[in-house]
From Swiss-Prot:
<feature type="modified residue" description="Phosphoserine">
    <location>
        <position position="425"/>
    </location>
</feature>
<dbReference type="InterPro" id="IPR002071">
    <property type="entry name" value="Thermonucl_AS"/>
</dbReference>
<dbReference type="GO" id="GO:0097433">
    <property type="term" value="C:dense body"/>
</dbReference>
<dbReference type="GO" id="GO:0031332">
    <property type="term" value="C:RNAi effector complex"/>
</dbReference>
<dbReference type="GO" id="GO:0005829">
    <property type="term" value="C:cytosol"/>
</dbReference>
<dbReference type="GO" id="GO:0006402">
    <property type="term" value="P:mRNA catabolic process"/>
</dbReference>
<dbReference type="InterPro" id="IPR035437">
    <property type="entry name" value="SNase_OB-fold_sf"/>
</dbReference>
<feature type="domain" description="TNase-like 2">
    <location>
        <begin position="192"/>
        <end position="327"/>
    </location>
</feature>
<dbReference type="Pfam" id="PF00565">
    <property type="entry name" value="SNase"/>
</dbReference>
<dbReference type="GO" id="GO:0004519">
    <property type="term" value="F:endonuclease activity"/>
</dbReference>
<keyword id="KW-1017">Isopeptide bond</keyword>
<dbReference type="GO" id="GO:0005737">
    <property type="term" value="C:cytoplasm"/>
</dbReference>
<dbReference type="GO" id="GO:0010564">
    <property type="term" value="P:regulation of cell cycle process"/>
</dbReference>
<comment type="function">
    <text>Endonuclease that mediates miRNA decay of both protein-free and AGO2-loaded miRNAs. As part of its function in miRNA decay, regulates mRNAs involved in G1-to-S phase transition. Functions as a bridging factor between STAT6 and the basal transcription factor. Plays a role in PIM1 regulation of MYB activity. Functions as a transcriptional coactivator for STAT5.</text>
</comment>
<dbReference type="GO" id="GO:0003713">
    <property type="term" value="F:transcription coactivator activity"/>
</dbReference>
<keyword id="KW-0255">Endonuclease</keyword>
<feature type="modified residue" description="Phosphoserine">
    <location>
        <position position="644"/>
    </location>
</feature>
């Protein structure tokens, strides 16, 4: 500034020195601040007061240190005078002369618009407009004072300004220093531009603005950015942060006392967040581009002009290391372009923030959605540590989030843009270990999945340190989406009660499974979602209608077994077990399917058929040579397609049929019998299978009698319920027992361990249970076994020998449970024994021999009997056994194990 190099003396020379500067600010109608040109930093400034004139004082707010002080209003015509100078001088070059300098340092002089004194005399212009007056008592003893006197007389004659009629009260502003409800004030403007004057610049990104026409004086913080500030010390002084003064000057030189428009976007405490619009540009973006500011996440979401513009401007300054970014080190890129952007197929959704995709190479990759956090338990919602947590159902909104992603993405191709790789982290006392994570932006049809999830309130946005660049490339859109979700009370941000999902997991719970079985059988095809694939033929399903989880086994096929971890060893999987599992996963995992439940096994697993898009999964596995047809398929409606699929796979000699060789058909010579075997089959209903392969049946012919008795008995009990705890059970006594389904059945007490443990046998169904005595009662005489005998009769299979090995026996029992439990069969008594009659059992529809089917599958061995009437059937059983041995099925997988010393293992030839 020229005045910094040559200034007038305090006494004032005869010919004052002409100095130049740029008007920074107009303090009032008779005082301005001028500055010089910047050279390596903010330039020096000085205040110039106009000589010989007086303008009204502007309003002043009472000092905060004087609570009883009152605000001083504008004097009449003070604000018009200030505005006259502001519009004429701000940012313009002026020249001035100093005529007088007080002992306190105040400088008085003349100011001219332009580079020399030939320009407009500002004092004369003010007086001529009636916005200022000559100082009282001043004598017109020089040309300048004479001209002021003439200007004042002309203004009076023309009744301009303060000389007009009236007291000038209409020129006094009603200044409003505070706003009672800033949020309501901001919302009332609906983000429409408001005319304003910037009255003060606190730092590069915080200003004081006068909003027009209502004269609200408000502090405005620029949305989305923050400049270096001036730190206030304990002694009251201010210490600027690096580049704070430069940033302040940058904003001052462009906005101070300029006419602008402000978009009021939000509020923070009593301060308003906004964007200042000027005809020459957007100061927010300019500050970023010049390296005077950085983006801030907490307010960038409310920026209405496009947050991506701010990020781009910041990136521009970072790349060039401008000012506050002079020490910036960009993150190292360690990914090839092909690894950074790719298209992949979504195979699985993991909770609510990660997916598993299949790459074009066939490899699988887990992708985490960048910068979002799935729903989680917090505060009072944290459950008892002793209770097993099921995140999908127990964490509020986790199920909704997972379902949103599942329905949108499963089986679809998505675009993946990797944003960052989160390195592996070790476990601490409070945080578990994390493996390396690939975090990316995933889009489908141009929609950012993470943004959609956040906008529905089904996820939240992670907050980072300001200098952390490891974040989503669309981070600002995520913040904006979260702000919308919070404002609209969506999902996690809702004030309503959180949704509760009471999902019963009946996997492996035999008693619960038995209760559900009749409902699922009657339902026919039920809708389901495949939650997990254990193996090619074993799945976990969620049934939405029944709100339960079940383990489901595919019927009609024999799929290769996968590897199993047993105590002390790892059992290797059968060939092609992994391929079968992968095939099923790719086809049905997390897809919506339809299932037909036919039966259940001993472990409470349901058995049936699974359909997806009209295709039967059992048939598809056989068709792709990943399974073989099980003999139980013979009585199903899908036997023909299964058989044709298997035949085609055999001919191709693929996978499980790679070493298939057609076996020559052995002719079995008929054995002449002296005595014919008696075959008189009667219909029965199989109700229970025991662990030693015995079973209980009900006579179909007396079934209606049992139904009528049960109906009458339950009606009687409902009218006269037993008193809880009044019945004292004794071994061998008949009673009534309350089963898990809440109904009463006839039973017999087998053992009393304690009042809390009473062993009972249900005489009409053949199953056993341990109950407390409080769930037992005396059997009413009207429903005793004299009225209707016990309906469950125990039988054993004839002509077969049950394996002594526990695993092998379990396989045989499971097979029988799948095939005949809760189904109608045909029974023929072959011979008697000390324990129970031995019988052959046939399927009611196909007339296939159940026991013979077990032999064919290599699940049991033949019991050779010498009676002549059984020779024909024994021969058939032995031939089936030889076929199973040749095919190395189940018991015979390692050849004929029945060596000379096999007796010690419980086997006999």
């Amino acid at each position: 500034m020229a005045s910094a190099q040559s200034s007038g003396s305090s006494g004032g020379p005869a010919v004052p020195t002409v100095q130049r500067g740029i008007v920074k600010m107009v303090l009032s109608g008779c005082a301005i601040i001028v500055r010089g040109q910047p050279r390596g930093g903010p330039p020096p400034e000085r205040q110039i007061n106009l000589s010989n004139i007086r303008a009204g004082n502007l309003a002043r707010r009472a000092a905060a240190t004087q609570p009883d002080g009152k605000d001083t209003p504008d004097e009449p015509w003070a604000f018009p005078a200030r505005e006259f100078l502001r519009k004429k001088l701000i940012g313009k070059e002026v020249c001035f002369t100093i005529e007088n300098k007080t002992p306190q340092g105040r400088e008085y002089g003349m100011i001219y618009l332009g580079k020399d004194t030939n320009g407009e005399n500002i004092a004369e212009s003010l007086v001529a407009e009636g916005l200022a007056s000559r100082r009282e008592g001043m004598r017109a003893n020089n040309p300048e004072q004479n001209r002021l006197s003439e200007c004042e007389e002309q203004a009076k004659a023309s009744k301009k300004g303060m000389w007009s009629e009236g007291n000038g009260s209409h020129t006094i502003r009603d200044l409003k220093y505070t706003i009672e409800n800033p949020r309501h004030f901001v919302d009332s403007h609906h983000q429409k531009p408001v005319n304003a004057i910037i009255e003060h610049v606190r730092d590069g990104s915080v200003v004081r603005a006068l909003l027009l026409p209502d004269h609200y004086l408000v502090t405005v913080m620029l949305s989305g950015i923050k400049c270096p500030t001036f730190r206030r010390e304990t002694d009251g002084s201010e210490t600027p942060e690096p580049f704070a003064a430069e940033a302040k000057f940058f904003t001052e030189s462009r906005l101070l006392q300029r006419d602008v428009q402000i978009i009021l976007e939000s509020c923070h405490n009593q301060n308003i967040l906004g964007t200042i619009l000027h005809p020459n540009g957007n100061i927010t973006e300019l500050l970023l581009k010049e390296g005077f500011a950085r983006c801030v996440d907490w307010s960038i979401a409310v920026y209405t002009r496009g947050a991506e513009k701010l990020r781009a401007a910041e990136r521009f300054a970072k790349e060039r290391r401008l000012r506050i970014w002079r020490d910036y080190v960009p993150p190292t890129a360690n990914l090839d372009q092909k690894d950074k952007q790719f298209v992949a197929k979504v195979m699985q959704v993991l909770n609510a923030d990660a997916i598993v995709v299949k790459l074009n190479s066939g490899d699988y990759k887990t992708i985490h959605l960048s910068s979002i956090r799935p729903p989680r338990l917090e505060g009072d919602n944290i459950q008892d540590k002793n209770k097993k947590l099921r995140p999908l159902y127990d964490i509020p909104y986790m199920f909704e989030a997972r379902e949103f992603l599942r329905k949108k993405l499963i089986g679809k191709k998505v675009s993946v843009t990797v944003d960052y790789i989160r390195p592996a982290s070790p476990a601490t006392e409070t945080v578990p270990a994390f493996s390396e994570r690939t975090c990316a932006t995933v889009t489908i049809g141009g929609i950012n999945i993470a943004e959609a999830l956040v906008s529905k309130g089904l996820a939240t946005v992670i907050r980072y340190r300001q200098d952390d660049d490891q974040r989503s490339s669309h981070y600002d859109e995520l913040l904006a989406a979260e702000a919308r979700a919070i404002k609209n009370g969506k999902g996690l941000h809702s004030k309503k009660e959180v949704p509760i999902h009471r999902v019963a997991d009946i996997s492996g719970d035999t008693q619960k499974a038995k209760q559900f079985l009749p409902f699922l059988q009657r339902a026919g095809r039920s809708e389901a979602v495949v939650e997990y694939v254990f193996s090619g033929s074993r799945l976990k399903l969620y049934l939405p209608k029944e709100t339960c989880l079940i383990t489901f086994l595919l019927a009609g096929i024999e799929c290769p077994r996968g590897a199993r971890n047993l105590p002390g060893l790892v059992q290797e999987g059968e060939p092609f077990s992994e391929e079968a599992t992968l095939f099923t996963k790719e086809l049905v995992l997390q897809r919506e399917v339809e299932v037909e439940v036919e039966s259940m096994d001993k472990a409470g697993n349901f058995i049936g058929w699974l359909h997806m898009d009209g295709a039967n999964l059992s048939v598809l596995l056989v068709e792709h040579a990943l399974s073989k047809v099980h003999f139980t398929a013979e009585r199903s409606a899908y036997y023909k397609p299964l058989l044709s699929a298997e035949e085609a796979a055999k001919q191709r000699k693929e996978k499980v049929w790679a070493h298939y060789e057609e076996q020559p058909v052995e002719e079995v010579m008929p054995v002449l019998e002296e005595k014919e075997r008696s075959a008189s089959y009667k219909p029965v209903f199989v109700t229970e299978i025991t662990d030693d392969l015995h079973f209980y049946v009900q006579d179909v012919e007396t079934g209606t009698q049992l139904e009528k008795l049960m109906e009458n008995m339950r009606s009687d009990i409902s009218s006269h319920p037993p008193v809880e705890g009044a019945y004292a059970p004794r071994r061998g006594e008949f009673c009534i027992a309350k089963f898990v389904d809440g109904e009463w059945y006839r039973a017999r007490v087998e053992k009393v361990e304690s009042p809390a443990k009473v062993h009972v046998f249900y005489i009409d169904y053949g199953n056993r249970e341990i109950l407390p005595s409080t769930r037992l009662g005396a059997l009413p005489p009207a429903f005793s076994t004299r009225v209707l005998p016990a309906q469950a009769t125990e039988y054993a299979f004839a002509f077969i020998q049950v394996p002594q090995d526990e695993d092998a026996r379990t396989d045989a029992v499971d097979s029988v449970v799948r095939d005949i439990q809760n189904t109608q069969c045909l029974l023929n008594v072959e011979h008697l024994s000390a324990s129970c009659p031995h019988v052959t059992l046939q399927f009611a529809d196909s007339k296939g021999d159940v026991g013979l089917g077990l032999v064919k599958e290599g699940l049991v061995m033949v019991e050779v009997r010498k009676e002549k009437q059984f020779q024909k059937v024994i021969t058939e059983y032995l031939n089936a056994q030889e076929s199973a041995k040749s095919a190395r099925l189940n018991l015979w997988r390692y050849g004929d194990f029945r060596a000379d010393d096999a007796d010690e293992f419980g086997y006999s030839r």
